[in-house]
Amino acid sequence: MPHSYDYDAIVIGSGPGGEGAAMGLVKQGARVAVIERYQNVGGGCTHWGTIPSKALRHAVSRIIEFNQNPLYSDHSRLLRSSFADILNHADNVINQQTRMRQGFYERNHCEILQGNARFVDEHTLALDCPDGSVETLTAEKFVIACGSRPYHPTDVDFTHPRIYDSDSILSMHHEPRHVLIYGAGVIGCEYASIFRGMDVKVDLINTRDRLLAFLDQEMSDSLSYHFWNSGVVIRHNEEYEKIEGCDDGVIMHLKSGKKLKADCLLYANGRTGNTDSLALQNIGLETDSRGQLKVNSMYQTAQPHVYAVGDVIGYPSLASAAYDQGRIAAQALVKGEANAHLIEDIPTGIYTIPEISSVGKTEQQLTAMKVPYEVGRAQFKHLARAQIVGMNVGTLKILFHRETKEILGIHCFGERAAEIIHIGQAIMEQKGGGNTIEYFVNTTFNYPTMAEAYRVAALNGLNRLF
Protein backbone atom coordinates (compact mmCIF):
# COMPACT_ATOMS: atom_id res chain seq x y z
CA MET A 1 0.00 0.00 0.00
CA PRO A 2 1.54 3.37 -1.04
CA HIS A 3 2.65 5.66 1.77
CA SER A 4 0.73 8.90 2.27
CA TYR A 5 2.85 12.05 2.61
CA ASP A 6 1.90 15.65 3.38
CA TYR A 7 3.57 16.78 0.14
CA ASP A 8 4.96 15.29 -3.03
CA ALA A 9 8.02 17.46 -2.53
CA ILE A 10 9.39 19.98 -0.05
CA VAL A 11 11.84 22.61 -1.25
CA ILE A 12 14.18 24.03 1.39
CA GLY A 13 15.05 27.61 0.44
CA SER A 14 13.33 30.22 -1.75
CA GLY A 15 16.32 31.67 -3.61
CA PRO A 16 16.76 31.23 -7.39
CA GLY A 17 17.39 27.48 -7.09
CA GLY A 18 14.44 26.89 -4.78
CA GLU A 19 12.16 29.07 -6.87
CA GLY A 20 13.15 27.27 -10.08
CA ALA A 21 12.48 23.90 -8.47
CA ALA A 22 9.18 24.94 -6.84
CA MET A 23 7.79 26.52 -10.02
CA GLY A 24 8.89 23.53 -12.09
CA LEU A 25 7.21 21.13 -9.67
CA VAL A 26 3.86 22.94 -9.31
CA LYS A 27 3.64 23.36 -13.10
CA GLN A 28 3.82 19.56 -13.31
CA GLY A 29 0.99 19.15 -10.80
CA ALA A 30 2.99 18.29 -7.69
CA ARG A 31 1.92 19.25 -4.16
CA VAL A 32 4.77 21.44 -3.02
CA ALA A 33 5.78 23.37 0.09
CA VAL A 34 8.69 25.78 0.21
CA ILE A 35 10.45 26.36 3.53
CA GLU A 36 12.09 29.76 4.02
CA ARG A 37 13.85 30.64 7.27
CA TYR A 38 13.41 34.40 6.78
CA GLN A 39 10.22 36.44 6.67
CA ASN A 40 10.47 37.24 2.96
CA VAL A 41 11.11 34.98 -0.02
CA GLY A 42 14.01 35.46 -2.42
CA GLY A 43 16.97 34.08 -0.51
CA GLY A 44 20.43 35.57 -0.34
CA CYS A 45 20.33 36.57 -4.00
CA THR A 46 17.48 39.01 -3.43
CA HIS A 47 18.30 40.28 0.06
CA TRP A 48 22.10 40.26 0.52
CA GLY A 49 23.76 39.28 -2.75
CA THR A 50 23.04 39.84 -6.41
CA ILE A 51 20.16 42.32 -6.26
CA PRO A 52 21.38 44.77 -3.58
CA SER A 53 25.00 44.81 -4.78
CA LYS A 54 23.91 45.44 -8.39
CA ALA A 55 21.49 48.15 -7.25
CA LEU A 56 24.36 49.78 -5.31
CA ARG A 57 26.60 49.51 -8.34
CA HIS A 58 24.00 51.08 -10.62
CA ALA A 59 23.48 54.05 -8.30
CA VAL A 60 27.22 54.65 -7.96
CA SER A 61 27.88 54.31 -11.70
CA ARG A 62 25.16 56.89 -12.44
CA ILE A 63 26.84 59.31 -10.00
CA ILE A 64 30.17 58.73 -11.76
CA GLU A 65 28.52 59.25 -15.15
CA PHE A 66 26.94 62.52 -14.01
CA ASN A 67 30.18 63.86 -12.56
CA GLN A 68 32.18 62.94 -15.66
CA ASN A 69 29.68 64.34 -18.16
CA PRO A 70 31.02 67.64 -19.57
CA LEU A 71 27.49 69.10 -19.40
CA TYR A 72 27.48 68.87 -15.60
CA SER A 73 31.08 68.52 -14.54
CA ASP A 74 31.83 72.05 -13.32
CA HIS A 75 32.94 71.77 -9.70
CA SER A 76 29.95 73.66 -8.31
CA ARG A 77 27.59 70.89 -9.43
CA LEU A 78 29.39 67.70 -8.42
CA LEU A 79 26.88 65.08 -7.31
CA ARG A 80 27.54 63.35 -4.00
CA SER A 81 25.51 60.76 -2.15
CA SER A 82 25.94 59.02 1.19
CA PHE A 83 26.21 55.26 1.55
CA ALA A 84 22.89 55.34 3.44
CA ASP A 85 21.15 57.08 0.51
CA ILE A 86 22.48 54.51 -1.93
CA LEU A 87 21.39 51.67 0.38
CA ASN A 88 17.85 53.12 0.31
CA HIS A 89 17.84 52.67 -3.47
CA ALA A 90 18.86 49.03 -3.00
CA ASP A 91 16.07 48.55 -0.42
CA ASN A 92 13.48 49.79 -2.93
CA VAL A 93 14.65 47.25 -5.50
CA ILE A 94 14.68 44.45 -2.91
CA ASN A 95 11.07 45.25 -1.92
CA GLN A 96 9.94 45.17 -5.55
CA GLN A 97 11.68 41.83 -6.12
CA THR A 98 10.21 40.34 -2.93
CA ARG A 99 6.63 41.34 -3.84
CA MET A 100 7.02 39.96 -7.35
CA ARG A 101 8.42 36.62 -6.19
CA GLN A 102 5.82 36.27 -3.44
CA GLY A 103 3.22 36.67 -6.19
CA PHE A 104 4.72 33.76 -8.15
CA TYR A 105 4.11 31.38 -5.23
CA GLU A 106 0.62 32.71 -4.51
CA ARG A 107 -0.52 32.49 -8.15
CA ASN A 108 0.71 28.92 -8.42
CA HIS A 109 -0.78 27.82 -5.06
CA CYS A 110 2.62 26.90 -3.69
CA GLU A 111 2.65 26.89 0.11
CA ILE A 112 5.33 28.97 1.86
CA LEU A 113 6.30 27.91 5.39
CA GLN A 114 8.57 30.05 7.54
CA GLY A 115 11.11 28.44 9.84
CA ASN A 116 14.28 26.36 10.07
CA ALA A 117 14.11 22.87 8.59
CA ARG A 118 15.99 19.83 9.84
CA PHE A 119 15.71 16.20 8.78
CA VAL A 120 14.28 13.71 11.27
CA ASP A 121 14.39 10.70 8.95
CA GLU A 122 14.44 10.02 5.22
CA HIS A 123 10.95 11.42 4.60
CA THR A 124 10.33 13.64 7.62
CA LEU A 125 11.31 17.22 8.42
CA ALA A 126 11.00 19.09 11.69
CA LEU A 127 10.19 22.76 11.14
CA ASP A 128 11.28 25.11 13.92
CA CYS A 129 8.78 27.97 13.59
CA PRO A 130 9.40 31.62 14.57
CA ASP A 131 6.93 31.35 17.49
CA GLY A 132 8.97 28.54 19.06
CA SER A 133 6.66 25.71 18.03
CA VAL A 134 7.84 22.68 16.05
CA GLU A 135 5.88 21.19 13.14
CA THR A 136 6.44 17.80 11.56
CA LEU A 137 6.22 17.61 7.75
CA THR A 138 6.53 14.61 5.48
CA ALA A 139 7.28 14.42 1.76
CA GLU A 140 8.16 11.79 -0.78
CA LYS A 141 11.06 13.85 -2.12
CA PHE A 142 13.11 16.91 -1.17
CA VAL A 143 15.07 19.66 -2.89
CA ILE A 144 17.80 21.31 -0.82
CA ALA A 145 18.29 24.86 -2.06
CA CYS A 146 19.41 26.53 1.15
CA GLY A 147 22.16 28.61 -0.45
CA SER A 148 25.40 29.79 1.09
CA ARG A 149 26.73 32.44 3.44
CA PRO A 150 30.04 34.31 3.71
CA TYR A 151 32.84 32.15 5.07
CA HIS A 152 33.88 33.19 8.60
CA PRO A 153 37.34 32.10 9.74
CA THR A 154 37.37 31.53 13.49
CA ASP A 155 40.17 34.03 14.14
CA VAL A 156 38.26 37.02 12.74
CA ASP A 157 35.87 38.82 15.10
CA PHE A 158 32.80 39.48 12.96
CA THR A 159 30.96 40.89 15.98
CA HIS A 160 33.21 43.97 15.84
CA PRO A 161 31.20 46.94 14.50
CA ARG A 162 33.80 47.75 11.81
CA ILE A 163 34.38 44.21 10.50
CA TYR A 164 31.89 43.25 7.80
CA ASP A 165 31.16 40.38 5.45
CA SER A 166 29.31 40.69 2.14
CA ASP A 167 25.95 40.30 3.96
CA SER A 168 26.50 42.68 6.87
CA ILE A 169 28.10 45.37 4.67
CA LEU A 170 24.53 46.23 3.63
CA SER A 171 23.85 47.29 7.23
CA MET A 172 26.78 49.70 7.43
CA HIS A 173 25.75 52.70 9.55
CA HIS A 174 28.79 54.95 9.21
CA GLU A 175 30.25 56.78 6.22
CA PRO A 176 33.46 54.96 5.30
CA ARG A 177 36.54 56.96 4.33
CA HIS A 178 38.96 54.07 3.88
CA VAL A 179 37.97 50.43 3.30
CA LEU A 180 40.13 47.32 3.46
CA ILE A 181 38.74 44.50 1.29
CA TYR A 182 40.22 41.07 1.97
CA GLY A 183 39.62 38.76 -0.97
CA ALA A 184 39.81 39.89 -4.59
CA GLY A 185 37.29 37.48 -6.05
CA VAL A 186 34.11 38.60 -7.80
CA ILE A 187 32.50 40.01 -4.63
CA GLY A 188 35.66 41.79 -3.51
CA CYS A 189 36.22 43.38 -6.92
CA GLU A 190 32.59 44.48 -7.23
CA TYR A 191 32.64 46.19 -3.84
CA ALA A 192 36.04 47.75 -4.59
CA SER A 193 34.38 49.39 -7.62
CA ILE A 194 31.40 50.56 -5.57
CA PHE A 195 33.44 52.12 -2.76
CA ARG A 196 36.01 53.70 -5.06
CA GLY A 197 33.14 55.14 -7.12
CA MET A 198 31.98 56.84 -3.91
CA ASP A 199 35.45 58.39 -3.52
CA VAL A 200 36.37 56.06 -0.64
CA LYS A 201 40.01 54.95 -0.33
CA VAL A 202 40.23 51.22 -1.09
CA ASP A 203 42.95 48.66 -0.35
CA LEU A 204 42.18 45.37 -2.11
CA ILE A 205 44.06 42.39 -0.66
CA ASN A 206 44.43 39.55 -3.16
CA THR A 207 45.63 36.13 -1.97
CA ARG A 208 46.62 35.25 -5.57
CA ASP A 209 48.97 36.74 -8.14
CA ARG A 210 46.35 38.38 -10.36
CA LEU A 211 42.71 39.44 -10.25
CA LEU A 212 40.02 36.97 -11.30
CA ALA A 213 42.43 34.44 -12.80
CA PHE A 214 39.58 32.49 -14.45
CA LEU A 215 39.05 35.38 -16.87
CA ASP A 216 40.83 35.91 -20.17
CA GLN A 217 44.08 37.60 -19.16
CA GLU A 218 43.38 40.76 -21.17
CA MET A 219 40.11 41.23 -19.29
CA SER A 220 41.83 40.66 -15.95
CA ASP A 221 44.61 43.08 -16.90
CA SER A 222 42.05 45.67 -18.03
CA LEU A 223 40.34 45.52 -14.63
CA SER A 224 43.69 45.79 -12.82
CA TYR A 225 44.65 48.83 -14.88
CA HIS A 226 41.25 50.46 -14.38
CA PHE A 227 41.49 49.92 -10.62
CA TRP A 228 45.03 51.33 -10.59
CA ASN A 229 43.97 54.30 -12.69
CA SER A 230 41.06 55.08 -10.35
CA GLY A 231 43.20 54.85 -7.22
CA VAL A 232 42.44 51.37 -5.85
CA VAL A 233 45.56 49.94 -4.19
CA ILE A 234 45.86 46.23 -5.03
CA ARG A 235 48.18 44.03 -2.97
CA HIS A 236 48.76 40.65 -4.64
CA ASN A 237 50.00 37.40 -3.04
CA GLU A 238 49.14 38.54 0.48
CA GLU A 239 47.49 36.69 3.37
CA TYR A 240 46.52 38.00 6.76
CA GLU A 241 48.38 36.99 9.90
CA LYS A 242 46.01 38.72 12.32
CA ILE A 243 43.03 41.07 12.13
CA GLU A 244 42.35 43.30 15.12
CA GLY A 245 39.47 45.67 15.62
CA CYS A 246 40.09 48.95 17.40
CA ASP A 247 37.92 51.92 18.43
CA ASP A 248 38.43 53.86 15.20
CA GLY A 249 38.74 51.02 12.69
CA VAL A 250 40.60 47.83 11.86
CA ILE A 251 44.29 46.90 11.69
CA MET A 252 45.34 44.03 9.44
CA HIS A 253 48.71 42.35 9.94
CA LEU A 254 49.87 40.55 6.78
CA LYS A 255 52.14 37.50 6.72
CA SER A 256 54.58 39.52 4.61
CA GLY A 257 55.16 41.81 7.59
CA LYS A 258 53.04 44.72 6.36
CA LYS A 259 50.42 46.42 8.52
CA LEU A 260 47.34 48.16 7.12
CA LYS A 261 44.78 50.30 8.90
CA ALA A 262 41.38 51.49 7.69
CA ASP A 263 38.13 52.56 9.30
CA CYS A 264 36.46 49.27 8.25
CA LEU A 265 37.14 45.85 6.76
CA LEU A 266 35.08 43.87 4.26
CA TYR A 267 36.06 40.20 4.49
CA ALA A 268 35.11 38.66 1.14
CA ASN A 269 37.16 35.49 0.86
CA GLY A 270 34.93 32.51 0.16
CA ARG A 271 31.48 31.18 1.01
CA THR A 272 30.14 28.13 2.82
CA GLY A 273 26.93 26.14 2.31
CA ASN A 274 24.00 26.62 4.72
CA THR A 275 23.79 22.91 5.51
CA ASP A 276 25.00 22.73 9.11
CA SER A 277 21.50 23.09 10.62
CA LEU A 278 19.77 20.54 8.35
CA ALA A 279 20.77 17.45 10.42
CA LEU A 280 21.83 15.71 7.22
CA GLN A 281 23.39 12.90 9.26
CA ASN A 282 19.85 11.69 9.96
CA ILE A 283 19.43 10.79 6.28
CA GLY A 284 22.98 9.59 5.68
CA LEU A 285 24.26 12.62 3.77
CA GLU A 286 27.64 14.26 4.24
CA THR A 287 28.98 17.61 3.04
CA ASP A 288 32.51 18.66 2.18
CA SER A 289 34.57 21.08 4.28
CA ARG A 290 32.70 24.05 2.80
CA GLY A 291 29.26 22.64 3.60
CA GLN A 292 28.54 21.66 -0.01
CA LEU A 293 26.78 18.55 -1.33
CA LYS A 294 27.80 16.31 -4.21
CA VAL A 295 25.16 15.66 -6.88
CA ASN A 296 24.87 13.80 -10.19
CA SER A 297 23.82 15.25 -13.56
CA MET A 298 20.16 15.28 -12.44
CA TYR A 299 21.06 17.02 -9.14
CA GLN A 300 20.40 13.93 -7.04
CA THR A 301 22.47 13.54 -3.90
CA ALA A 302 23.69 10.19 -2.55
CA GLN A 303 20.07 9.73 -1.40
CA PRO A 304 18.10 9.38 -4.68
CA HIS A 305 14.96 11.07 -3.28
CA VAL A 306 16.93 14.14 -2.13
CA TYR A 307 18.05 16.71 -4.70
CA ALA A 308 20.28 19.77 -4.24
CA VAL A 309 20.71 22.88 -6.39
CA GLY A 310 22.33 26.32 -6.28
CA ASP A 311 25.21 27.53 -4.12
CA VAL A 312 24.90 24.50 -1.86
CA ILE A 313 26.44 22.32 -4.61
CA GLY A 314 29.26 24.73 -5.43
CA TYR A 315 30.35 25.70 -8.95
CA PRO A 316 29.18 27.75 -10.80
CA SER A 317 27.39 29.46 -7.87
CA LEU A 318 25.45 31.79 -10.14
CA ALA A 319 21.84 32.88 -9.63
CA SER A 320 21.13 32.29 -13.33
CA ALA A 321 22.49 28.74 -13.20
CA ALA A 322 20.73 27.99 -9.90
CA TYR A 323 17.30 28.74 -11.39
CA ASP A 324 18.00 26.39 -14.31
CA GLN A 325 19.33 23.72 -11.95
CA GLY A 326 16.10 23.93 -9.95
CA ARG A 327 14.02 23.59 -13.10
CA ILE A 328 16.05 20.56 -14.26
CA ALA A 329 15.85 18.93 -10.82
CA ALA A 330 12.06 19.40 -10.81
CA GLN A 331 11.79 17.62 -14.14
CA ALA A 332 13.99 14.75 -12.93
CA LEU A 333 12.08 14.52 -9.64
CA VAL A 334 8.69 14.11 -11.34
CA LYS A 335 9.62 12.18 -14.49
CA GLY A 336 12.62 10.21 -13.28
CA GLU A 337 14.89 11.88 -15.81
CA ALA A 338 15.52 15.35 -17.20
CA ASN A 339 15.61 16.23 -20.88
CA ALA A 340 17.06 19.67 -20.20
CA HIS A 341 20.60 20.29 -18.97
CA LEU A 342 22.79 23.27 -18.22
CA ILE A 343 24.49 24.69 -21.28
CA GLU A 344 28.20 23.93 -21.55
CA ASP A 345 29.30 27.54 -21.88
CA ILE A 346 27.66 29.46 -19.03
CA PRO A 347 28.21 33.20 -19.45
CA THR A 348 29.99 35.06 -16.68
CA GLY A 349 28.89 38.55 -15.67
CA ILE A 350 31.02 40.55 -13.23
CA TYR A 351 29.46 43.83 -12.15
CA THR A 352 32.53 45.90 -11.51
CA ILE A 353 32.67 49.46 -12.87
CA PRO A 354 32.99 48.91 -15.83
CA GLU A 355 31.40 45.47 -16.22
CA ILE A 356 33.16 42.35 -17.46
CA SER A 357 31.43 39.48 -19.21
CA SER A 358 32.61 36.41 -21.07
CA VAL A 359 31.42 33.18 -22.61
CA GLY A 360 33.43 30.30 -24.03
CA LYS A 361 37.18 29.77 -24.08
CA THR A 362 39.92 32.25 -23.13
CA GLU A 363 43.03 32.89 -25.21
CA GLN A 364 45.09 31.05 -22.61
CA GLN A 365 42.89 27.95 -22.84
CA LEU A 366 42.94 27.90 -26.65
CA THR A 367 46.72 28.33 -26.73
CA ALA A 368 47.17 25.43 -24.28
CA MET A 369 44.83 23.32 -26.44
CA LYS A 370 46.86 24.24 -29.57
CA VAL A 371 43.73 25.45 -31.35
CA PRO A 372 44.50 27.67 -34.39
CA TYR A 373 42.44 30.69 -33.44
CA GLU A 374 42.34 34.34 -34.46
CA VAL A 375 41.20 37.44 -32.59
CA GLY A 376 38.79 40.18 -33.62
CA ARG A 377 38.59 43.35 -31.53
CA ALA A 378 36.35 46.40 -31.31
CA GLN A 379 37.18 49.37 -29.09
CA PHE A 380 34.14 51.10 -27.59
CA LYS A 381 35.72 54.51 -28.19
CA HIS A 382 35.35 53.96 -31.95
CA LEU A 383 31.58 53.27 -31.78
CA ALA A 384 29.19 56.15 -32.45
CA ARG A 385 26.77 55.05 -29.70
CA ALA A 386 29.58 54.91 -27.13
CA GLN A 387 30.75 58.38 -28.16
CA ILE A 388 27.21 59.75 -27.81
CA VAL A 389 26.73 58.42 -24.27
CA GLY A 390 30.33 58.92 -23.19
CA MET A 391 31.18 55.22 -22.79
CA ASN A 392 34.69 55.38 -24.18
CA VAL A 393 36.25 52.74 -21.91
CA GLY A 394 35.74 49.21 -23.15
CA THR A 395 36.45 46.55 -25.69
CA LEU A 396 34.83 43.49 -27.27
CA LYS A 397 37.03 40.55 -28.22
CA ILE A 398 35.92 37.60 -30.36
CA LEU A 399 38.04 34.43 -30.56
CA PHE A 400 37.33 32.24 -33.58
CA HIS A 401 38.82 29.23 -35.41
CA ARG A 402 41.01 30.32 -38.31
CA GLU A 403 39.75 27.58 -40.63
CA THR A 404 36.12 26.90 -39.72
CA LYS A 405 35.32 30.49 -38.57
CA GLU A 406 33.55 28.96 -35.53
CA ILE A 407 33.31 31.36 -32.58
CA LEU A 408 35.20 29.86 -29.63
CA GLY A 409 34.97 32.60 -27.03
CA ILE A 410 33.75 36.16 -26.51
CA HIS A 411 35.06 38.58 -23.90
CA CYS A 412 33.80 42.06 -23.16
CA PHE A 413 35.05 44.79 -20.82
CA GLY A 414 32.99 47.95 -20.51
CA GLU A 415 29.60 49.35 -19.57
CA ARG A 416 26.70 46.99 -20.47
CA ALA A 417 29.13 44.11 -21.07
CA ALA A 418 26.79 41.63 -19.35
CA GLU A 419 24.04 42.56 -21.85
CA ILE A 420 26.29 42.76 -24.91
CA ILE A 421 27.69 39.26 -24.35
CA HIS A 422 24.32 37.56 -25.00
CA ILE A 423 24.26 38.56 -28.67
CA GLY A 424 27.40 36.53 -29.24
CA GLN A 425 26.22 33.74 -26.96
CA ALA A 426 23.10 33.28 -29.09
CA ILE A 427 25.24 32.73 -32.20
CA MET A 428 27.67 30.41 -30.38
CA GLU A 429 24.75 28.14 -29.41
CA GLN A 430 23.61 27.68 -33.04
CA LYS A 431 23.92 24.19 -34.50
CA GLY A 432 24.55 22.96 -38.02
CA GLY A 433 27.18 25.50 -38.98
CA GLY A 434 25.22 28.44 -37.61
CA ASN A 435 28.02 29.31 -35.19
CA THR A 436 30.25 31.44 -37.41
CA ILE A 437 31.86 34.84 -37.05
CA GLU A 438 30.69 35.63 -40.58
CA TYR A 439 27.15 36.05 -39.21
CA PHE A 440 28.16 39.42 -37.80
CA VAL A 441 29.46 40.59 -41.16
CA ASN A 442 26.48 39.33 -43.15
CA THR A 443 23.78 40.78 -40.89
CA THR A 444 22.68 44.40 -40.58
CA PHE A 445 22.87 46.10 -37.19
CA ASN A 446 20.90 49.09 -36.00
CA TYR A 447 23.03 52.24 -36.03
CA PRO A 448 24.21 53.63 -33.72
CA THR A 449 24.23 50.77 -31.18
CA MET A 450 26.68 49.05 -28.87
CA ALA A 451 25.75 45.79 -30.63
CA GLU A 452 27.56 47.13 -33.68
CA ALA A 453 30.78 46.24 -31.85
CA TYR A 454 30.24 42.68 -33.10
CA ARG A 455 30.41 43.78 -36.74
CA VAL A 456 33.52 45.86 -36.09
CA ALA A 457 35.23 43.02 -34.20
CA ALA A 458 34.24 40.44 -36.83
CA LEU A 459 35.67 42.54 -39.67
CA ASN A 460 38.80 43.18 -37.63
CA GLY A 461 39.31 39.46 -37.05
CA LEU A 462 38.53 38.31 -40.59
CA ASN A 463 40.94 40.91 -41.97
CA ARG A 464 43.73 39.16 -40.06
CA LEU A 465 43.29 35.94 -42.03
CA PHE A 466 45.58 35.15 -44.96
Swiss-Prot record:
Names of the cofactor(s): FAD
Location relative to the cell: Cytoplasm
Record-level GO cellular component terms: cytosol
SUPFAM superfamilies the UniProt entry points to: FAD/NAD(P)-binding domain (SSF51905), FAD/NAD-linked reductases, dimerisation (C-terminal) domain (SSF55424)
Cofactor note: Binds 1 FAD per subunit.
Keywords per UniProt: Cytoplasm, FAD, Flavoprotein, NAD, NADP, Oxidoreductase
GO biological process: 2-oxoglutarate metabolic process; NADP metabolic process
Pfam families xrefs: Pyr_redox_2, Pyr_redox_dim
Annotated catalysed reactions: NAD(+) + NADPH = NADH + NADP(+)
Binding site for FAD: E36, R37, Y38, Q39, N40, V41, G42, G43, G44, C45
GO molecular function: dihydrolipoyl dehydrogenase (NADH) activity; flavin adenine dinucleotide binding; NAD(P)+ transhydrogenase (Si-specific) activity
Superkingdom of this protein's organism: Bacteria
EC code(s) of this entry: 1.6.1.1
Keyword NAD found: yes
Family to which the UniProt record says this protein belongs: Belongs to the class-I pyridine nucleotide-disulfide oxidoreductase family.
Record's function text: Conversion of NADPH, generated by peripheral catabolic pathways, to NADH, which can enter the respiratory chain for energy generation.
Subunit structure as annotated in this protein's UniProt entry: Homooligomer; probable homooctamer.
NCBIfam families xref list: PRK05249.1
HAMAP family noted in UniProt: SthA
Name of the protein described by the UniProt record: Soluble pyridine nucleotide transhydrogenase
